[in-house]
Regions:
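C-terminal catalytic domain of Rieske-type non-heme iron oxygenases
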Residues: 1-222
């Protein structure tokens, strides 16, 4: 498949996200299907939907947006149709709850996604090592009937393995996880070689990191 660099740059996740802190947890909300205000052109609703679905240049669109409907509204309709069997009252929820990325950080190590997203992250220590941890990605799934199926298989990746090896099992999430974690070794090396007395964090977009360190210092002090 041929990558479409134009469609991949439509969204301005860093610009449009909202970050909040509440006691011992933080929340981030990223609106999906909303183009960046800094684009030098105005994308069509079809271009927006194709970007949402990661359409490549040599692929057909997964669906054609009906006239008069926005890509965001259409994506919400598709999501509701998918959820209806498990959530009969899904029409009572707004588009943001079925469309957008809402992710929480519950101090110190649990990161559930909100609304109808099925992803959860958990970080656990590896003995007393300060530069290593276990990152767990937990994907919850609906099941039919009253009997709960057996637990899913626990799959463990080695330090030198890539998330993309799991694409046959978890689909496009393998690419997402790989994209989000491939630079972690470089970040770790940068932190270890950093010569300043403390980190410089942005006031807003790195609110989650600032809040975590604030909570850690509070617990250590007490």
């Amino acid at each position: 498949a041929l990558w479409n660099s134009k469609s991949s740059s439509i969204f301005g996740f860093q610009l449009l996200g909202r970050y909040d802190s509440f006691g011992n947890f933080t929340r981030a909300i990223t609106p999906n299907g909303t183009p960046s205000p800094h684009l030098p052109w105005v994308p069509s609703e079809q271009e927006i939907f194709d970007a949402i679905t990661d359409k490549r240049l040599d692929e057909d669109s997964l669906a054609l947006i009906p006239d008069g409907m926005t890509a965001r509204t259409f994506a919400a309709k598709v999501a509701r149709d998918r959820l209806r069997s498990a959530v009969p009252n899904v029409d009572d929820f707004c588009d943001a709850e079925v469309n957008d990325s809402m992710y929480f950080t519950l101090f110190p190590n649990f990161h559930p996604w909100g609304a109808f997203n099925r992803i959860n992250y958990r970080f656990r220590p590896v003995g007393k090592k300060v530069d290593e941890c276990v990152m767990e990605c937990i994907y919850t799934e609906d099941f039919e009937g009253d009997e709960r199926p057996p637990p899913a298989e626990y799959i463990e990746l080695g330090l030198d393995q890539e998330w993309t090896e799991l694409i046959p099992l978890i689909g496009n999430l393998g690419r997402v996880f790989q994209q989000d974690s491939f630079n972690l070794p470089k970040v770790q090396k940068g932190l270890e070689s950093f010569q300043a007395d403390g980190l410089t964090l942005t006031k807003y977009q790195e609110l989650k990191i600032r809040h975590w360190h604030s909570m850690a210092e509070r617990f250590i002090a007490n």
